UniProtKB/Swiss-Prot annotation:
Belongs to the FKBP-type PPIase family. Tig subfamily. Residues 163-248 form the PPIase FKBP-type domain. The keyword Kinase does not apply. This is Trigger factor. It catalyses: [protein]-peptidylproline (omega=180) = [protein]-peptidylproline (omega=0).
Amino acid sequence: MSTKWEKLEGNVGVLTIEVDAKEVNNSIDAAFKKVVKTINVPGFRKGKMPRPLFEQRFGIESLYQDALDIILPKAYGEAIDEAGIFPVAHPEIDIEKFEKGQNLIFTAKVTVKPEVKLGDYKGLAVEKVETTVTDEDVENEVKALQERQAELVVKEDGTAADGDTAVIDFEGFVDGEAFEGGKGENYSLAIGSGTFIPGFEEQVIGLKSGDSKEVEVSFPEEYHAAELAGKPATFKVTIHEIKTKELPELNDEFAKDADEEVATLDELKTKLRTNLEEGKKHEAEHKVRDEVVELAAANAEIDIPEAMIDTELDRMVREFEQRLSQQGMNLELYYQFTGTDADKLKEQMKEDAQKRVRINLVLEAIIEAENIEVTEEEVTAEVEKMAEMYGMPVDAIKQALGSVDALSEDLKVRKAVDFLVDNAA
């Protein structure tokens, strides 16, 4: 087999591939063995039709497409290896010559991975992030715990205020007609939570148990139910009960209820401070890593093929679909609720997809430029770390991974980011 690679404009080139006649004949033979199994001919058992009779009745040309399906993937794969190129999309194949006893000649128009011209990626100036934890930070955490342990108690003589919970009956009307999903009984409405239509909760403030009121609101223009979007509505509301939060007293008992590993309020505050410090440090490290990567990517020159962005968009949509399924939703429901479609979703994701592709290409280029490698011991250590994290045997992790090649590449990327951080200004 012979291969010729001709680079065209941008990231496109043409492979001209010539395959020996012997391989062509072998592919036609393989195609016959495949096709003959599907043919019933009187006087012969299924799959036993003689080759000469087959060619006489159907013509040898009837085998050519199946033969091409057999020979092309292998020939194309060998050709891109020989040419040392990295396609990022399916090729455009053009068959110039294919017949029994003759060499196969075909061309493949290929979009390849772009050249990356790295800019400055050492000595990048990054902003230092403040990681100090103040007494106020700790007190805010204590207050958050106190809020989570609060009990709702009936507000006997009071009126509804922001932060209270009103137990209500409601029924909504648009143009004087009740609408589907607009009615509820004994519904616990947390005032100020923003769970109802804008303007609804504010009009409940000041009401008391036993009060009734007509609440006038308008549905948002982007409301998920298109038939209601932008329309004014009237809700008849009856208040059954007003509840308010009763916060627990801040003492050692509160601390023990909040965290069984502590015995006093002071111990709880110390633990909260430690957790906050670790969290801020972790957040600062991530911010620096993200910043150096984005700076290195911005400094590079790359002509990114649309095919790479399209591939990344498809991957992002699949990831989004998986997240939706974990919430009991699917894409069709999402499109219905948001008034979008597949094209609009991809358009929203396109900027992030471009950013992802650029960053990946730049990190790959840095790995090559700095000769970043991963040892077998480092891969083994990472597998053992994963086994401990997931509580699984090491062999089970290895089996789940199948090949450690992807893990090895991930570790190289991590090392590349480490390199950028270590060499930042």
